[in-house]
Amino acid sequence: MSYNNKSIKELHELLVNKEISALELTKATLSDIQAREPQIDAFLKVTEEKALKEAAAIDARGINPDVVTDGISIGVKDNIVTEGIETTAASKILGGWIPPYNATVANKLSQSGLITIGKLNMDEFAMGGSGENSSIKPTKNVWDQTKVPGGSSSGSAASVASGEVRLSLGSDTGGSIRQPAAFNGIVGLKPTYGRVSRFGLIAFASSLDQIGPLTPTVEENAQLLNVISGFDKNDSTSSNVSVPDFTSKIGQDIKGMKIALPKEYFGEGIDEKVKEQILAAAKHLEKLGAIVEEVSLPHSKYGVAVYYIIASSEASSNLQRFDGIRYGYRAQDIKNLEDLYVKSRSEGFGPEVQRRIMLGTFSLSAGSYDKHFKKAGQVRTLIINDFAKVFEKYDLILGPTTPTAAWDLGARVDDPISMYLADLLTIPVNLAGLPGISIPAGFADGLPVGMQLIGKRYDEETIYQVAAAFEATTDFHKKQPIIFGK
């Protein structure tokens, strides 16, 4: 029997009332994964034996009635370090690496009774927006297996949208949670920068990376954010701010809420069908009592250029540690030390990772630093100021999550610029360190369209309040791909 249509609150009730055991639920989840995996390739590793052992231990001690996540399975993106479980970031260079420690979020999952059931596929080192850059295998879109699932958290989105798991963790550097959530018709949140510890997250761009939850519904998303948030002394960028109950405003009226609609988010490059769905969603929020007004974020058009300079520069620095000596892939038949470095990195990193390392190295070079990296930092400040100005008058910003719905597998592989532009609307949120969510808001040619809601720093509750109000009065989140029922 499959339980994939039940929320974690409903599953919790079944577990507390002993209508099902954690072991039975875990076995059902493993069956769901086995049935769907051949079509979507969301998982890189399923930790069946470990998961069953943990479930049996939970049954032995008894379900905690006060912890809604106790005994529930979760999938974890493969750039989040898990002790004793191979963690590769979907890269050949980390093949076979078994971490001796847990990421802080992995410990928090265990402390909340969540069972890590496997590691999820992704674009290599989280570099990519389609899911095609995994060095192992590409994940497929659950609505149409000829389409991309989005990236880089491709497996995190596909595993939830297909009904393999109810919950997953991803990471978001320029849209890597929100974009695949949009493409697969689920809920994905990038929390405020510093809200969730990055200790144990394999670094891509340290000033932009953030771990976040992907779920079928808004409430489950907030429940998972409750688990993973909080200050961590092991992460110097972790914020020591109080952590609220993120579900506290769910169900509250949104009458009088002021929502900004940036004109730049509906301009050139935005598909007409996507635009139509998002403007209809804005009208729907007006009917619920929100005040929606057009604003301008004038520097957002520079976001993609700024991002690819800053992110690539940080990546070129972060990825220096993969040298073929300390851990990971080591080339054979080498002549000297330099040859070891060159061959190990050339053979171990995929083409997109190499492209970004070269771009970053160029941006940081003596002749380009002022012209590129320094200038990008200055424009980043202008983007931050644009958001701050809008948030003086408005509670939230609304727009499409992506300019288009999912495209064909392989269609943009040889055109990196068109691939990069897919993150046009999500990147500014990372540059400003703000929280942003994608929720299902319609369909374009049978493929899901996501609506993005952007909030003030540390105000995820208001995002969840408005997202839940929209979800409760629409049925987009209830629509499921054919694969879900298999």
UniProtKB/Swiss-Prot annotation:
GO terms for molecular function: ATP binding; glutaminyl-tRNA synthase (glutamine-hydrolyzing) activity. This is Glutamyl-tRNA(Gln) amidotransferase subunit A. The lineage of its organism: Bacteria, Bacillati, Bacillota, Bacilli, Lactobacillales. It catalyses: L-glutamyl-tRNA(Gln) + L-glutamine + ATP + H2O = L-glutaminyl-tRNA(Gln) + L-glutamate + ADP + phosphate + H(+). It comes from the Bacteria. It is an enzyme of class 6 (ligase). Keywords: ATP-binding, Ligase, Nucleotide-binding, Protein biosynthesis. It comes from Lactococcus lactis subsp. cremoris (strain SK11). GO terms for biological process: translation. Belongs to the amidase family. GatA subfamily. Its EC number is 6.3.5.7. The active site is at K77, S152, S176. One of its GO terms (cellular component) is glutamyl-tRNA(Gln) amidotransferase complex. Pfam families: Amidase. HAMAP family: GatA.
